[in-house]
A protein has these predicted regions:
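Catalytic-domain carbohydrate-binding cleft regions of carbohydrate-active enzymes
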Residues: 1-262
Length: 262
């Protein structure tokens, strides 16, 4: 989900249910770095990430700025600091990472090209990151190249390797990220987007109310509510919070209707 358009409780459930699902298939998986393809950020994330055991984060989405992007700030690393004071070591959208000329969806980091790297060097960024997550199935990537054709001698590493083996691994630059530094743009959808937002918020409120009522009933008279039913309610709500439900609500789904209709 985009995170800036749903409740804090929903963000927590997205992590809780998502981590549980992944561990049902990969029991030994570790969750170390939060990095996303789309602009799925909000100011309170450092606190939530820390509670789920994450150590690092990235504020970059250089090839998916349709739905938004973070404000440019800082150099190689920052301590992304939430309103409550919780911080997490983060690779930001650098102060020198500009919006790509003649593009409405990219920053200059998307292709790790020479002008971007030179701008990073001028800003004393020793280990610039040029990254772009791509949807599974795209035929024309990876954009930075592969095999013997990798642009500017780029090196592919995981975020964990970058933070722990390549970067300095620490910084004194505390970035107190306000919600206003999340520059958002849900430009497709108009009236249907308003309806989606209203229905999602109504469902968020009703699910939490149902859980509270169930707890009170259990304490009062031993009533045992159906956890599986509530889990299914959260599952379908979380699908409605998927970023594509908001950014492209009129897109078709395998000739089975649109995101909005489902």
């Amino acid at each position: 989900p985009y995170c800036y358009n749903i409740s804090g409780e929903s963000i927590i459930r997205q992590f809780a249910y998502g981590i549980r699902k992944i561990r049902s298939h990969f029991p030994d998986v570790e969750f170390v770095t939060y990095s996303v393809e789309e602009p799925c950020f909000t100011s309170s994330l450092p606190q939530i990430l820390r509670l789920f055991g994450f150590k690092y984060a990235s504020l970059k989405c250089p090839n998916t700025c349709w739905g938004g992007y973070t404000a440019p700030y800082g150099g190689e690393l920052v301590n992304w600091t939430a309103p409550d004071g919780t911080s997490i070591l983060t690779s930001p959208r650098y102060a020198c990472e500009e919006l790509q000329p003649n593009s409405v969806w990219q920053t200059t980091a998307w292709g790790n090209e020479t002008p971007y790297i030179e701008a990073c060097i001028r800003q004393d960024i020793a280990h610039p990151v040029g990254m772009c997550y791509q949807d599974a199935g795209w035929r024309y990537g990876p954009w930075i190249g592969s095999g013997d054709s990798i642009r500017n001698n780029s090196i592919y590493v995981t975020w964990r390797e970058y933070f722990e083996r390549i970067s300095e691994g620490r910084t004194t630059d505390d970035y107190r990220f306000p919600q206003e530094d999340m520059h958002v743009s849900l430009m497709w959808g108009s009236q249907v987007l308003q309806r989606i937002a209203q229905q999602v918020r109504e469902s968020e409120n009703k699910l939490v109310m149902a859980e509270k009522a169930g707890v009170i009933a259990n304490l009062a008279n031993g009533y045992r509510y159906g956890q599986a039913t509530l889990d299914e309610g959260w599952r379908t709500l979380m699908l409605a919070q998927h970023h594509d439900s908001w950014i492209v609500p009129y897109n078709g789904l395998n000739r089975q209707g649109t995101w909005a209709q489902h």
